[in-house]
């Protein structure tokens, strides 16, 4: 690197970008700097590197040309775990910016740095190399995987970790590196092959045995804590090793099989620690040791992917309560917050929706892969998941989720939505969810998530629909306007175009929730029509009877608003006439609920003469309505009687034509049959009134 002495005397405004870069590196290479100054210099360097890509496109030389191997050593040296957190954080951003700006040359220099440090093999060099690898893994996973999978590297970690004299910082840095590496499938497989045995040894170490064995080997050894601790793994190191093992057990490598420890070296016992044992270790750590909360939560986040662990954790009331408290106190967007949310998401997750054909195909594949022995895990069935959801809810999770939703990231919001979605599957919990703020949470999350996050937004909308199906809108929307729920609900009326299978349940639930909202006031009805009428109308033609019925029920409530009824069915347009035909046809459907919903809509619509004119103009119009009067259902007979009474009550030409058409279609006989079948005073009264008018017509 060129020296900075020649440029130090110039003011920063007159320096070229290359000279500014050299000057910053000169400052970073000097010792004895205050942390604030180091952070500031790293920040300035990061800014220069971030700007470099755009400026080089305009023809300016890149500042990476003056960044040599020594400079790279300087930047990544600040990733050392022994550096203050603020310095490490800024160095991480700077390293990321450098790798982006330098491209392949940057990756080459970083690779050379890593291999050089590992080859030196001093404790200090190991610490820095391992810290760099763990930090850049999320930034450059391909590069870091290549470094860790270098021939001989992972096997060399065993002798290092089994040394008689332990360096806690080396061990911590090494385990942090392996922890990060487990995000990658190939690395996870290699760690399982080369590292699982000594990881087991660390986790299984008994401190008392370590002291006894050491004294037996060397009776003259000083057995005070200070000396012995250098010969055994610290509690923190054991906990980190347990987390790595949990990741290996929870997400086994494809070729590792289900026989942990099968790659054991001669004389080394096979791995025996199960995921359930690791889980118990993490829960004990969570409850008894506040100093290792982050480690315990990270371990449980992976361990709780397994069904047995889910069951044990859900039944452990003390641990559940502690997890809720941990989430409550976790900083927004922190790893601790994300880890705790992941645990609750795992505990409450239902199996994904599958068609019958998909279920059969999945069973056949599982049967073939397991040689005819594999059965579905009963602990993951809906009954067990529902019970876990109940226990999680009773632990007080909802108010905490509501609080964290205000400051959540996209990832944490997605997990939060997933948890509420699962809890809302249980109808008995929906009212309490609404009371505790779940409706506000879901509306806020749906609004906050970018449109590109379609899946979590649809999940939030469906959870909202479920809660609103089972609750009174007047009680739910005391602080939040109920119009805020309309856009999320209408967004899932149309089935997900990106889904592999056509799932109509969200459509059905959205229609039911909107029907509930439409029962409240005309403003809400108008908002629903403006937001989604075309989508609602399309569902009338659904081949799924429950969906088409739900659409008619919604329309039945929407037309309670005179303004909406006239705008949709009474403006005399061709579209309005066609809509009348469709509702008439649905009043003649085979399904009783569909006929009932269509009859309810017509009972409101026939208050308008233009709609009556449209009905009587249809040859099948009057007969369909009279069939309602003859129906075996008292409710349908009531609807039919109201419709007929409305039609004949109109004055002028419309009423006269309606009376004539109905009488010609057999209205007197139909209403006579209706009154004989009915027991309800309301039905009998309206039928008698209608008959009196029609008999006068005759």
Segments predicted by a language model, with ranges:
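Alpha-helical solenoid repeat architecture
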Residues: 2-9, 39-58, 77, 86-102, ...
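Long amphipathic alpha-helical scaffold regions
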Residues: 5, 20-273, 283
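Flexible loop/turn segments at the boundaries of HEAT repeats in alpha-solenoid HEAT proteins
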Residues: 14, 54-65, 100-108, 140-148, ...
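Core helices of alpha-solenoid repeat scaffolds
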Residues: 17-22, 64-73, 104-115, 146-155, ...
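Acidic, Ser/Thr- and Gly/Pro-rich intrinsically disordered linkers and low-complexity segments
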Residues: 28-29, 204-234, 276, 327-336, ...
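C-terminal interaction modules of eukaryotic adaptor/scaffold proteins
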Residues: 484, 524-527, 542, 567, ...
